From Swiss-Prot:
Tagged with keyword NAD: yes
GO annotations of cellular component type: cytoplasm
Protein name in the entry: Glyoxylate/hydroxypyruvate reductase A
Enzyme Commission code(s) on record: 1.1.1.79, 1.1.1.81
A GO molecular-function descriptor: NAD binding
Catalytic function, reaction form: glycolate + NADP(+) = glyoxylate + NADPH + H(+); (R)-glycerate + NAD(+) = 3-hydroxypyruvate + NADH + H(+); (R)-glycerate + NADP(+) = 3-hydroxypyruvate + NADPH + H(+)
Organism classification: Bacteria, Pseudomonadati, Pseudomonadota, Gammaproteobacteria, Enterobacterales
């Protein structure tokens, strides 16, 4: 079994060695320009077109949970990968726990009004504030995939009312499910904290805009853990300035790194991190990839395959 590996920043030698330990019958090599030798599987992140074009691969694994970048490249260069070759994304591989940590800590930060107390500290004001109640702090998750389910699971322990919105009905314990555009308004009207975990598709670009934000309760919060292109940043800032939104926590942006001139840097009710909410953890990624390849070789059912038509 031949496996080729390409990632512009990962330590390729470490990955090659770890993969060969996990798959003793495989030969793994780092792909370099000019390498046209046969391969059965490819592990990639932002691969050049020529790496995959013309290859008769059994499968391609994208070294991350998001597949929007490679799907965009495939649309622009259909010769890059035959439509019959399955494409897999990393399914959890430690990202679920990271998302749970990030989302739960931020919801609790807002719930306990730590943002307000920080603002009071900056003014040297000693002023206890009224508490929020859990009943008035409903959390709504848009994007009900693997990571959305993990986030909902982590928040259940804290007793917040939970709801999710997605393309298909979910039956998660303790979570109210909303489906499609026709149920979006009802979902938003009672959502105090909106957590975005949507995939990046043509249908979801710019979805967090003034029309959507206006349907949230006054004083709501937005937590974006998915993609920056989901948010119309000017609309978000306007909602913060008007008081419609009380705060926003952003891990992703339409342009990364975020330009120095962006007003998001200076807005007092915007907190941010540099796209670190859930990163690829090599050991867990290798465990998932090696297990999935073994299942594919045995003809067993697998999970994590990308639906190219849907975009995730």
């Amino acid at each position: 079994m031949e496996i080729i590996f390409y990632h512009p920043t990962f330590n390729a030698a470490w990955w090659v060695n770890a993969l060969e330990k996990a798959l003793p019958h495989a030969r793994v090599r780092e792909w370099k320009v000019g390498d046209n030798n046969p391969a059965d599987y490819a592990l990639v992140w932002q691969p050049p077109v020529e790496m995959l074009a013309g290859r008769r691969l059994k499968a391609v694994f994208v070294l991350g949970a998001g597949v929007d970048a490679i799907l965009s490249k495939l649309n622009a260069h259909p010769e890059m990968l035959d439509a019959s070759i399955p494409l897999f994304r990393l399914e959890d591989t430690g990202m679920g726990l990271q998302m749970q940590e990030y989302a739960a800590s931020q919801v609790l930060h807002w719930f306990r009004r730590f943002d307000d107390y920080q603002a009071l500290k900056n003014q040297a004001l000693w002023k206890p504030l009224p508490e929020y109640t859990r009943e008035e702090f409903s959390v709504g998750i848009i994007g009900a995939g693997v990571l959305g389910a993990k986030v909902a699971e982590s928040l259940q322990a804290w007793g917040f009312p939970l709801r999710c919105w997605s393309r298909s009905r979910k039956s998660w314990p303790g979570v109210e499910s909303y489906v499609g555009r026709e149920e979006l308004r009802a979902f938003l009207n009672q959502t105090r904290v909106l957590i975005n975990l949507l995939p990046n598709t043509a249908q979801t670009v710019g979805i967090i805009n003034s029309e959507l934000l206006d349907q949230l309760p006054d004083g709501a919060y937005v937590l974006n853990l998915a993609r920056g292109v989901h948010v119309q940043e000017a609309d978000l800032l306007a909602a913060l300035d008007s008081g419609k939104l009380k705060g926003a926590m952003l891990d992703v942006f339409s342009q990364e790194p975020l330009p120095q001139e962006s007003p998001l840097w200076r807005h007092p009710r915007v907190a941010m991190t540099p796209h670190i909410a859930a990163v690829t953890r090599p050991a867990e990624a290798i465990d998932y990839i090696s297990r999935t390849i073994t299942q594919l070789e045995k003809g067993e059912p697998v999970t994590g395959q990308v639906d190219r038509a849907r975009g995730y």
